[in-house]
């Protein structure tokens, strides 16, 4: 499964449902990251966001989401997904947290800018599911 434009074609207004606060928070993080990462990495991140949203809709990712993408220039994202740029391995691991972090550009801060959005607890009847998908390109 390679993240291509065809595989993750957007339908305006339907990708992130308004009734899901977790998906809304995820959309915020994705758009924020896309303002920093462009080109291939930006496309991959957007694809990962769509996968995460689908898992939320299916009830697989239960109460919260985590985004994590490593990049040489930024230590940005973790979306409960880690993308290794050298081996081009896509790992998808459901987590129950939503966390987004970007390094501060202000050296006086001496820390990192961290943003997190809480999600409501979902039904306790949903099974605790954790999936991991590993795909290698080429």
From Swiss-Prot:
GO terms for cellular component: membrane. Its main location: membrane. Keywords: Membrane, Transmembrane, Transmembrane helix. It is a multi-pass membrane protein. The keyword Phosphoprotein does not apply. Residues 109-138 are annotated as: Disordered. The chain crosses the membrane at residues 32-52, 65-85. It is found in: Membrane. This is Putative protein encoded by LINC02912.
């Amino acid at each position: 499964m390679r993240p291509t434009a065809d595989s993750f074609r957007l339908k305006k207004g339907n990708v992130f449902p308004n009734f899901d606060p977790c998906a809304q928070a995820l959309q915020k993080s994705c758009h924020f990251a896309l303002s920093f990462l462009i080109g291939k990495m930006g496309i991959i991140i957007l694809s990962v966001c769509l996968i995460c949203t689908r898992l939320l809709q299916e009830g697989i990712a239960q109460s919260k989401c985590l985004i994590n993408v490593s990049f040489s220039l930024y230590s940005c994202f973790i979306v409960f997904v880690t993308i290794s740029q050298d081996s081009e391995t896509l790992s998808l691991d459901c987590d129950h947290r939503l966390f987004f972090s970007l390094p501060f550009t202000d050296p006086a801060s001496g820390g990192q800018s961290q943003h997190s959005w809480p999600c409501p607890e979902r039904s306790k009847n949903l099974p605790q599911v954790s999936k991991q998908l590993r795909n290698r390109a080429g």
